[in-house]
Design a protein with these regions (language model features):
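…; additionally, a secondary subgroup of soluble metalloenzymes is captured
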Residues: 1-156, 165-315, 319-327
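Beta1/beta-strand and adjacent pyrophosphate-binding region of the FAD-binding site
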Residues: 159
Length: 327
């Protein structure tokens, strides 16, 4: 039954028949229903592919707007979902043992995302951002510490996940929201331009002055920020009771070790690198969407663990920059 149903749904999408219904249910409703049923679970990837292909077809045509403020608003309210549909389409497409039956749908989906959405969006954003002198009206990443960290009344753990773009952050936000013990909020911030790791990481530290040296090193108030120890020195110059840690170092620590490190600290920066580590290399860039899913899982698990083991309840999750990616 599921194989026949999947073939029918795929045919409807290949014909771009978004109004197709079965027993009064739309394509996304059918996919969600079948995934929950016993025999449909073994076809979860196929149903997720179909559901997200539908999302790209239904919402993928980019609507030009006037001005960067409206472009930002439209992305937050609608366009980020297109990026998310694209991410999940390939996340599950890559899990298929045999993708031959879905190649035609993949080509159609890719064409819509690339030509009807991404290309038009980039032209519009570049034009609007240039006209606005590089100002979006969003809070600036340059003001992150003074705006978000310095004013905190309790110990704050800042988790900086390299290349955690907005729509992936929304996925994490929704996961946190679903936890009845958690109160989460989500907001956007304008990254520094150009949006490279070295600039974004420096901007997230407390500073009065950020400079790019002739050798392309970035300094904060005259101090280097290339590695963990250098960033910790910058942070401790402003907040003595603070630490900078790597996610990979603390994920395997015992409870006693965590408590020893976190006791007495007011601010702890945790650097997490799952997405950029794989997406920024040609040999692993096709794994970037799997890395996004793993990043959400890892950050969620870290928050749960530190809440119990390190007596911490206030977290800020942010990124140095985002990313654009297409197959």
């Amino acid at each position: 039954v599921d194989r026949r149903l999947i073939a029918w749904l795929r045919g409807r999408l290949e014909s771009e028949d978004l109004d197709a219904r079965l027993d009064g249910k739309s394509i996304p409703e059918i996919c969600a229903l079948r995934r929950r049923l016993h025999f449909g679970r073994q076809f979860r990837s196929e149903y997720f592919i179909l559901e997200n292909a539908f999302g790209i077809m239904a919402h993928g045509s980019y609507t030009p707007v006037s001005g960067i403020a409206d472009a930002v608003r439209q992305y937050i309210e609608r366009d980020e979902a297109v990026d998310r549909h694209y991410r999940y389409f390939y996340l599950y497409f890559d899990r298929l043992e045999n993708s031959a039956d879905f190649e035609r749908l993949r080509d159609l989906t890719e064409n819509i995302y690339t030509n009807d959405h991404l290309n038009k969006q980039l032209v519009g954003w570049n034009r609007s951002l240039t006209e606005a002198g590089g100002k979006t009206g969003l809070p600036r990443q340059l003001d992150f510490y003074s705006r978000c960290v310095r004013t905190a009344r309790e110990r704050t753990v800042v988790i900086i996940s390299d290349a955690l773009r907005y729509e992936v952050g929304r996925t994490l936000f929704e996961r946190l929201q679903a936890d009845e013990k958690c109160t989460a909020t989500l907001s956007a911030m304008q990254a520094v331009l150009p949006s490279y790791t070295r600039f974004g990481m420096a901007a997230l530290l407390p500073h009065k002055r950020i400079e790019l040296c002739p050798d392309l090193r970035v300094t904060v108030d005259g101090k280097p920020t290339d590695d963990l120890k250098q960033r910790e020195a910058v942070l401790q110059a402003v907040q003595p009771n603070s630490r900078c840690l790597r996610f990979d170092d603390i994920r395997s620590m015992k409870v006693a070790e965590l408590r020893e490190i976190f006791t007495g600290q007011d601010v702890v920066y945790v650097y997490h690198n799952q997405i950029d580590a794989r997406g920024d290399k040609a040999s692993t860039e096709n794994e970037v969407f799997a890395a996004c899913e793993e990043a959400v899982d890892e950050i969620f698990a870290l928050i749960k663990r530190l809440t119990v083991s390190a007596n911490t309840i206030h977290y800020i999750i942010t990124a140095d920059h985002g990313f654009l990616y297409k197959r």
